[in-house]
C-alpha cells in the first residue's frame, strides 16, 4: 500500500531507525532524512554513520547531516544550507525520534502538520534525555511511548497518542529499548494513517501534575553505593546496561557488574563485603539485603557469567568493595 502523506524524518540511533523503517515499509514517501553527522566510535574510533543514515542510504533516501539547525548557532553556514533544503523539499509532516539536535521555531512551523515526536515514556513522566534508564532505575512498573506535537519546550508538547509497555523484572535498558522502539514504530504509523485519512490528530495538553525529568546518564553514575538497598542497586545495574554499566572497586581494580538481583542479606556484614561465592554468583552485602551479581567483567576483559569469571579471577568471602565516594 502506498500513501500520499509526505514525511520528512529526523532521527539518529536504532530507536529512530525502527520508526523510519516502519514508515517506509508502510508506504509513506520520505523525501528527506535528517540525522546527526558521522561520529568516531568503536575501539579504533573510526567515523561511523548513524543507524538512521545506514537504513536510509540502503534504500536510496536523501540524507542530510547538519551539525546544527540554528541560523545564529555555532555552524551558521551548514544550518542555513539545511534550512534551505527543508524549505525546498515538499512535505506534509516531520517525524522526529531521538534526533539529538534542537529544532528552532522556524522548523517546527514549517510542515503543514507540524513536527511529531516519538518519546520513550508516558509523558509528562520522564521528559528529557534518558527516559528508559530512569524508568527502570526508579522501579516503575510500566512505561511506554508518547507521540506529541512538538513545541519549543523540552518534551512539553501536546500528546497525540500513547502506547503502554510493562517493565519486566529482568528488563534492562537494552531489552526495554527494543520493546519501546517496536511500540513507537507501530504507534507512529497508525498516527500517520489517521492523519492522512482525517487531516488532523486530536491533541491533549500534558497535565501539570506528574512531571519528572530524565537527566542524561553520566559515566560517574556507574559506581554502586553499597549503603543503598540491594533492590535499588539491582535496578541500577539493569538500568545502566548497556551504558555505563554498574561498577565496584575491589583492591584498586574497577569491576563492571552487568547482571544482579536482590537476595536476603546478613546483618553482621558491612556494606560492600562479599558474603558468599558460588556458581550462581557473588553475593555482596548492602545497606538492606544483599546483591547477587551473576555477570562480571574485569578491566580489559569480557563480560562473563559469574562461574567463568571466577575461574580466571578468584574472589574471596570477606573482601570488601570500596565505598562509592572513595572509589
Swiss-Prot record:
Classification via InterPro entries: Fmt, Formyl_trans_C, Formyl_trans_C_sf, Formyl_transf_N, Formyl_transf_N_sf, Formyl_transferase-like_C_sf, GART_AS, Met-tRNA-FMT_C
Keywords, in A-Z order: Protein biosynthesis, Transferase
Catalysed conversion reaction: L-methionyl-tRNA(fMet) + (6R)-10-formyltetrahydrofolate = N-formyl-L-methionyl-tRNA(fMet) + (6S)-5,6,7,8-tetrahydrofolate + H(+)
Gene from which this protein is expressed: fmt
Homology family: Belongs to the Fmt family.
Binding site for (6S)-5,6,7,8-tetrahydrofolate: 121-124
Species annotation: Burkholderia pseudomallei (strain 1106a)
Annotated Pfam families: Formyl_trans_C, Formyl_trans_N
HAMAP family per the UniProt record, alphabetical: Formyl_trans
The name this protein goes by in its record: Methionyl-tRNA formyltransferase
PANTHER family the record matches: METHIONYL-TRNA FORMYLTRANSFERASE, METHIONYL-TRNA FORMYLTRANSFERASE, MITOCHONDRIAL
This enzyme's EC code(s): 2.1.2.9
Database matches in PROSITE patterns: GART (PS00373)
Function, as annotated: Attaches a formyl group to the free amino group of methionyl-tRNA(fMet). The formyl group appears to play a dual role in the initiator identity of N-formylmethionyl-tRNA by promoting its recognition by IF2 and preventing the misappropriation of this tRNA by the elongation apparatus.
Gene Ontology molecular function: methionyl-tRNA formyltransferase activity
GO cellular component: cytosol
